[in-house]
């Protein structure tokens, strides 16, 4: 009985921590850059693009393909940064919990 109460308490604590982390992640802003800073994309914790900056030198018809590649590279870098931040947050939250190694949390 004592073990069950302890598990329920830990589950409630974990739920509260998860909610806090989700709120923190929603407010997180990361920027990915490409082309030595010619293109930058900022994402929030929900992987929503909040800003795109493009150096005017890339706004030429003959530079379209390069620009497209740089936008994708900047987005992918920003997305990777968000994923790393989420992993770090969830790792600290789940420390000490008996979870299977491949257990996926709902927001990771």
UniProtKB/Swiss-Prot annotation:
Q: Does the keyword 4Fe-4S apply?
A: no
Q: What is the lineage of its organism?
A: Bacteria, Pseudomonadati, Pseudomonadota, Alphaproteobacteria, Hyphomicrobiales
Q: Any idea what this protein is called?
A: Nucleoid-associated protein BH02310
Source species, please? Bartonella henselae (strain ATCC 49882 / DSM 28221 / CCUG 30454 / Houston 1) (Rochalimaea henselae)
Q: Sorted alphabetically, which Pfam families does this protein's record hold? A: YbaB_DNA_bd
Organism domain of life = Bacteria
Q: What does this protein do?
A: Binds to DNA and alters its conformation. May be involved in regulation of gene expression, nucleoid organization and DNA protection.
This entry carries the following GO cellular component terms, namely:
bacterial nucleoid; cytosol
Q: Which UniProt keywords apply?
A: Cytoplasm, DNA-binding
Subunit organization: Homodimer.
HAMAP family on file? DNA_YbaB_EbfC
Q: Which PANTHER family match?
A: NUCLEOID-ASSOCIATED PROTEIN YBAB (PTHR33449:SF1)
Intrachain disulfide bonds: none
Q: List the NCBIfam families hit by this protein, alphabetically.
A: DNA_YbaB_EbfC
User: Which GO MF terms are attached to this record?
Assistant: DNA binding
InterPro entries, from UniProt?
YbaB-like_sf, YbaB/EbfC
| Protein family (similarity comment) | Belongs to the YbaB/EbfC family.
């Amino acid at each position: 009985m004592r073990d069950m109460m302890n598990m329920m308490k830990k589950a409630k604590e974990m739920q509260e921590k998860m909610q806090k982390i989700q709120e923190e992640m929603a407010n997180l802003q990361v920027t990915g850059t490409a082309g030595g800073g010619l293109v930058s994309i900022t994402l929030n914790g929900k992987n929503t693009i909040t800003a795109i900056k493009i150096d005017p030198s890339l706004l030429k018809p003959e530079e379209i393909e390069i620009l497209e590649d740089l936008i994708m590279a900047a987005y992918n870098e920003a997305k990777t940064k968000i994923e790393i931040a989420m992993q770090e947050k969830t790792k600290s939250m789940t420390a000490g919990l008996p979870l299977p190694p491949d257990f996926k949390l709902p927001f990771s």
